[in-house]
Amino acid sequence: MHYIAGTELRMPVQIRRADQHMAMFSVDADAAQAMIADSGLEVCRVRPGRAVVVLTFMHYIDGDLGRYYEYATNVMVNPPGSTRSGLSALQSAGAFCHHMPVDQAFTLEAGRTIWGYPKVMADFTVRPGRQFGFDVSIDGQLVVSMEFRPGVPVPSAFTSKTQEHPTYSHLDGVTRETLGKMALSGVRYRLGGVRMRLGDHPYARELASLGLPKRALVTSSARNVEMTFDDAREIA
């Protein structure tokens, strides 16, 4: 149990409704490793010299942390102690949350306090519709702008099963692992499918160091996401 801004949060934290847009990219593994070096974790090398970065936009609609927007830069990493590589290694990999701007103070405090997520306050401009888009800016500087083209619907039988995956974070010198569960519905996928523009914020320069913007491997959207988050565990 945690108390955030005078509100009691019982674990696991529940997200009952959210929608998601995601873009997956192949990036230079050494550049990705340099970006997360302080964490002590190792990027998952899916091919020689290549790693995977996933950029996500979430609109949390109904959950214990309230209603808010969130952008995240996630680097896929091996579990601590693992040296697996190749595409099959992604099955056990977790998402290291490197950037995580949000637009509400409560989720910012909860994220940083409970899980060590690097949440910072940001401004979002959201363009709903068949071709979904958003901009995220911090202190008046654009981080990234993304425009998604709709994908092909995927039957819920393939996506609605609850999945459990770890996420990792590094904040104030501490690396943490958090186990979470997720179930998706209303999912669409497509190859490519996103147009992105980087701004002049330091986060944007980090994304540029990975070779972005470039064509995405795959993009997806989910009309509804249900999630739970356990307490974090310090691992380094």
Regions picked out by a protein language model, each given a short descriptive name:
Residues M1-D64, Y68, P80, Y203, ...:
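N-terminal domain-onset segments
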Residues Q20-A23, A37-V43, L87-Q91, C97-D103, ...:
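Generic detector of short, locally flexible boundary/turn motifs and exposed helical patches
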Residues M1, M11, M22-M24, M35, ...:
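Detector for methionine-enriched segments
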Residues A34-S39, P48, R67-Y69, L87, ...:
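Generic alpha-helix signal with a bias toward terminal, lower-confidence helices
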Residues M58-V143:
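Aromatic- and glycine-enriched beta-alpha-beta binding-site module
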